[in-house]
Amino acid sequence: MSSVSPALQPRRIKARFIGPLALTLAFIMCVFAVAIYSIETRIRDRDLAERSAAVAKLFAQKLDKDTHKMMATLRAMMINQAMVNAFRQGDRTALAQQGGELFRSLNAEHKITHLYFIRPDLVSLYRFHSPAVFGDDIQRVTLQQARESQKPAHGLELGPMGTLTLRLVTPWRQDGELLGYLEIGEEIEHLLDEIRHSLAIDLLVLVDKRYLTPAQWQRGLDLLRGKIAGEEGQHPGDA
């Protein structure tokens, strides 16, 4: 009849507990890891939601501020009698003389990239940012809204190269006569840069290709290639 040495009995007792204890510890570690991951996920989601809300709020504030600035600019132009006469007569040369320097100043100091004089029939009379292009029908939403309501209308719209532009359109009436419409706009890239610096975050604007015409897509690609080529050719000391 065999007998177990007293020295081996504690080892057998320990062996019986090691397996269950190891499983218990492994289970506890798994639960702990899941809990930590869940907490980190909630913190990350909350941080993302707070950042998104901050971006949306700041973006709306900047759009509102710039819209008021553009409206003030248009009102100043509408009390310029020389511009009134030039617009009423459809005199492109006079418009260029009266507003050319103003547009250059607005572009350099306030990032204004678009300025239009548009006839009552929504045909472009003069583009300060592109004088050679005129006589085309303009069918943008903001212009249609301004015509239907006969009140200022503004909003973000895609430009001809797929760039987002804040546009403001207002009817121009003089002594009850509708002379046409004034449209002013700014591409919003500088607003995004300001938000990046203010909130220390990266922003990326994506445009669904389905909403672009082939011509817009190609012009956008050409513009992007030009920017990349310019940055690659820039000397580090010139940055």
Where are the language model's segments positioned?
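Extreme N-terminal signal-anchor transmembrane helix of membrane signaling/transducer proteins, especially
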Residues: 3, 11-42, 46
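Residue-level signal for short hydrophobic patches within transmembrane helices
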Residues: 19-23, 56-59, 63
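Extracytoplasmic/periplasmic sensory segments of membrane signal-transduction proteins
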Residues: 50-59, 66-153, 196, 207-215, ...
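Mobile, glycine-rich extracellular loop/lid and propeptide segments
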Residues: 65, 143-144, 158, 168
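Generic short beta-strand
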Residues: 115, 169-170, 203
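Short clusters of small/polar residues that mark proteolytic maturation junctions
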Residues: 129-130, 157, 183
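Conserved beta-strands of PAS-like sensory domains
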Residues: 163-197
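Intrinsic low-complexity, intrinsically disordered coil/linker regions enriched in small/polar
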Residues: 190-239
